Regions:
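Intrinsically disordered or low-complexity boundary/linker segments at protein termini
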Residues: 1-17, 132-145
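Small/aliphatic-rich secondary-structure junction motif
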Residues: 3-53, 83-85
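Short, hinge-like loop/turn segments at secondary-structure boundaries
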Residues: 50-54, 101-103, 125-126
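Short beta->alpha linker loops
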Residues: 51, 86-90, 112
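A short acidic, glycine-rich active-site loop
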Residues: 53-66
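Structural beta-alpha unit
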Residues: 73-107, 145
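Glycine-rich, Arg-bearing micro-motifs that act as flexible, cationic patches
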Residues: 106-128
Length: 145
């Protein structure tokens, strides 16, 4: 049933926790896990300085590659088929768009991301994906300490 699993990661501990859940599901189902990182370039589009915009974009993409390497390493350790993708734009929209175009069976993501506002938000990205995706979504809660 879950042969094509998409997990969104933002490099946070919450994103890594979601990746672990996705990889466990992939291992159990024999499926392939695709990790996606979306560089939120919408937040930077209003910046007046093109060089600053370019620098921030490059930093976001570098951060994304590092986040995806972490998930890839876990996938190798667990023996799960893995691939990765990077997108730019609004994270919620890009996750849904990628999942639909790639024919994913499920989307997995952390209920909260990097934001410190998690008491106000399910996680704006998670909420957008849950509300708008036609594909089943599994949100992974923050680990309780």
């Amino acid at each position: 049933m879950f042969e094509k699993i998409l997990v969104a990661t933002d490099g946070s501990e919450h994103g890594l926790r979601a990746a672990r859940v996705a990889l466990e599901l992939g291992k159990i189902s024999g499926g392939r896990v695709t990790a996606i990182y979306v560089a939120d370039t919408n937040r930077t589009s209003h910046l007046p300085d093109d060089m600053l915009l370019f620098s921030i974009r490059e930093l976001l993409l570098k951060e994304g590659k590092e986040a995806l390497k972490q998930v890839e390493s876990l996938a190798k350790d667990m023996g799960v088929a893995f691939e990765s993708a990077v997108a730019e734009g609004n994270p919620g929209s890009e996750i849904i768009s990628y999942a639909e175009s790639a024919g994913m069976d499920i989307i997995i993501l952390g209920a909260v991301g990097r934001t410190g506002l998690d008491k106000f938000l399910l996680g704006s990205v998670a909420e957008k994906v849950v509300r708008n995706s036609k594909i089943p979504v599994l949100t992974v809660p923050r680990e309780q300490t």
